[in-house]
A protein has these predicted regions:
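Structural signature of nuclease core domains in nucleic-acid processing machines
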Residues: 3, 7-145
Length: 145
């Protein structure tokens, strides 16, 4: 799965696999922790990936992106890099909150991608900006923006 992400830019299958694993391994208690729990789970899964240097909560453009997967170009000829923005909704949140949260995430991730030194960190790789929104432990929406 990680080969496809690194060399072909095919990220959906990998991230859906992790989202499914999160659902299968989560409990009501996990939902109480919300976004932090999701971030920890994704960080653990993605950290076993040798193609990238993981940077959770990296400061970019006056904010902190949830996960920045910087290519490890010293060891691999990776073609793609990623910024992941993770969002959590409770099962009781309204559709209006869902839409508002998504719009804010789009604004955030675009600001992160525009940060001056992001280009240096991703070098000549294609940067994918992906928002992953959960409702409880269910994947609500996942898109590249």
């Amino acid at each position: 799965l990680f080969d496809e992400m690194a060399y072909e830019g095919h990220w959906r299958e990998t991230l859906e696999f992790i989202a499914h694993a999160y659902k299968e391994n989560s409990s009501v208690r996990s939902a109480m922790e919300g976004e932090r729990n999701i971030q920890g789970f994704f960080t653990a899964y993605l950290s076993v990936n040798a193609y990238y240097l993981m940077a959770p909560e990296m400061e970019l453009s006056h904010g902190y992106c949830d996960l920045f997967l910087m290519p490890d170009l010293m060891r691999y000829e990776v073609k793609h890099s990623y910024i992941l923005e993770l969002k959590y909704l409770s099962v009781k949140d309204t559709e209006e909150k869902t839409r508002t949260q998504w719009q804010e995430a789009v604004k955030q991730i675009n600001e992160y991608a525009a940060a001056p030194w992001v280009r240096q960190l991703v070098q000549n790789t294609k940067l994918h900006c992906i928002i992953i929104q959960f409702r409880g432990w269910e994947l609500e929406r996942m898109e590249e923006v």
